[in-house]
Amino acid sequence: MNHQARMRWRCRRGMLELDIVLQRFIDNHYEQLDEHQLELFEMLLSLSDHDLWNIIIGNTKEPNNQFQPVLKLLQEN
């Protein structure tokens, strides 16, 4: 299984909303991500569904803005 396929699998979550946003992100942006953005995306995927969703929709601010390069793309989806 290649890296993109593994990431696509990790994007399958317990929330339909997250599944939709994350799958669209993979479809639309994965190929253009640089190494740093890929690392940030993997770190985001390690968060709980609830925490990740709240960060994406802006209900929770991330503490140090480290995810902004990827969050901006996620929020476009």
From Swiss-Prot:
Keywords: Chaperone, Cytoplasm. Its main location: cytoplasm. GO terms for cellular component: cytoplasm. The keyword Nucleotide-binding does not apply. This is FAD assembly factor SdhE. It comes from Nitrosomonas europaea (strain ATCC 19718 / CIP 103999 / KCTC 2705 / NBRC 14298). It is found in: Cytoplasm. One of its GO terms (biological process) is succinate metabolic process. The lineage of its organism: Bacteria, Pseudomonadati, Pseudomonadota, Betaproteobacteria, Nitrosomonadales.
